[in-house]
């Protein structure tokens, strides 16, 4: 998170600089700075382009505008904002240890990018909850469009509330002629306020959402993988739909695992640093921080790649979006995949599915000769 990195880096780095002249203890050779700049630039370009394309694919094609995909839009928007604002400006600050962007942007940097990170994990949690209801409880009412929009708005409001303390206590200081953007916690004896904030953020924005998603996807997986297909339908549409649901769940589990792996070292960096403050005085800590921050920010660029690799509709959308590239050749099937509506027979089949699922809920596999398998909610779960 932008503010957290700024606070720790600047407060520690400032103390070191007060005993140095000219070049700071955290300066790095030009070639090293160029390598880091290239790594961060590549990350930002891939993340912004990929997430903007995901948003376009969903908004530009009516067939893709579904409850789960609106949460995916929210996730993509949050990741795009994190890459554009947090990764870019925090890298400049961490590599130079000077705040170039003014007081107003100091407040902004300690609010909006942090909010976006919170929105990202909460959007993934909302997707897990939506899939849980659709697959485990298929006969329960699904979220309506107004409720979905209200949920997304609520996610942003909660995220803003969690990020606001850092923004409120943000300030500009000047140390040895260098401008700093720091968070001055009131009466923070021994850094207890900072440690408490890091622990609260870790629990509310990392640990608890991951526990909720782990439970949700575990139940979803058990429900899908134990679901049997009647023998006479083993090669029909129901089997394809069941496989599509499984593929979507695998994709979202991969998204969650990627987020968890990318962000865990970054959270631990700040929590452990609250107990061992002397580690921030080691010269190698700047390189450690830049590596951990890049790993955390890289989570913003993986999701579009996962969607493209594991979902045929998003793959078609990416081909259409990049059709101007000479090595990309979209087909008519790609266009139809995003624009055609389900056939009458498929819609009738979905209605029949709901009826027969209800009638055969307690039947064994051998008895369900007229049953339909799969949730009646989403024929193509990858574009639910």
Curated annotation (Swiss-Prot):
One of its GO terms (biological process) is positive regulation of flagellated sperm motility. Glycans are attached at residue 19. Residues 1-32, 91-107, 171-196, 273-290 are extracellular. The keyword Cell membrane applies. It is found in: Cell membrane. InterPro entries: GPCR_Rhodpsn, GPCR_Rhodpsn_7TM, Neurokn_rcpt, NK2_rcpt. Pfam families: 7tm_1. The chain crosses the membrane at residues 33-56, 70-90, 108-129, 150-170, 197-218, 252-272, 291-310. It is a multi-pass membrane protein. This is a receptor for the tachykinin neuropeptide substance K (neurokinin A). It is associated with G proteins that activate a phosphatidylinositol-calcium second messenger system. The rank order of affinity of this receptor to tachykinins is: substance K > neuromedin-K > substance P. Belongs to the G-protein coupled receptor 1 family. This is Substance-K receptor. The lineage of its organism: Eukaryota, Metazoa, Chordata, Craniata, Vertebrata.
């Amino acid at each position: 998170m932008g503010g957290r990195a700024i606070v720790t880096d600047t407060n520690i780095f400032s103390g070191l600089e007060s005993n140095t002249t000219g070049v700071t203890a955290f300066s790095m050779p030009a070639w090293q700075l160029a390598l880091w700049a290239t790594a961060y630039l590549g990350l930002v370009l891939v993340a912004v382009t990929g997430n903007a394309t995901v948003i376009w694919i969903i908004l530009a094609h009516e067939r893709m505008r579904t409850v789960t995909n609106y949460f995916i839009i929210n996730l993509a928007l949050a990741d795009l904002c994190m890459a554009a604002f947090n990764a870019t400006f925090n890298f400049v600050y961490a590599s130079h240890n000077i705040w170039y962007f003014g007081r107003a942007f100091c407040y902004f940097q300690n609010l909006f990018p942090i909010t976006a990170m919170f929105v990202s994990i909460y959007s993934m949690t909302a997707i897990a909850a939506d899939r849980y209801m659709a697959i485990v409880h298929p006969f329960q009412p699904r979220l309506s469009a107004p409720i979905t929009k209200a949920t997304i708005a609520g996610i942003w409001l909660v995220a803003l509330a969690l990020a606001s303390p850092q923004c409120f206590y943000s300030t500009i200081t000047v140390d040895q002629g260098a401008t700093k953007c720091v968070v001055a916690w009131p009466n923070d004896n021994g850094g207890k306020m900072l440690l408490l904030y890091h622990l609260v953020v870790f629990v509310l924005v990392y640990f608890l959402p991951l526990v909720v998603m782990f439970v949700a996807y575990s139940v979803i997986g058990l429900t899908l993988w134990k679901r049997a297909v009647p023998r006479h339908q083993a090669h029909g549409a129901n089997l394809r739909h069941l496989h599509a649901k499984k593929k979507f769940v695998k994709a979202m589990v991969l998204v969650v695992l990627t987020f968890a792996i990318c962000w865990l070292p970054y959270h631990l960096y700040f929590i452990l640093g609250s107990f061992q403050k002397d580690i921030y005085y080691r010269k190698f800590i700047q390189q450690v921080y830049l590596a951990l921050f890049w790993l955390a920010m890289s989570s913003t660029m993986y999701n579009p790649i996962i969607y493209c690799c594991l979902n045929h509709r998003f793959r078609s959308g990416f081909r259409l979006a990049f059709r101007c590239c000479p090595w990309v050749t979209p087909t008519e099937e790609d266009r139809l995949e995003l624009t055609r509506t389900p056939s009458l027979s498929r819609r009738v089949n979905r209605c029949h599915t709901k009826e027969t699922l209800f009638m055969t809920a307690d039947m064994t596999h051998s008895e369900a000769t007229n049953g339909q398998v799969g949730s009646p909610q989403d024929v193509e779960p990858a574009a639910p």
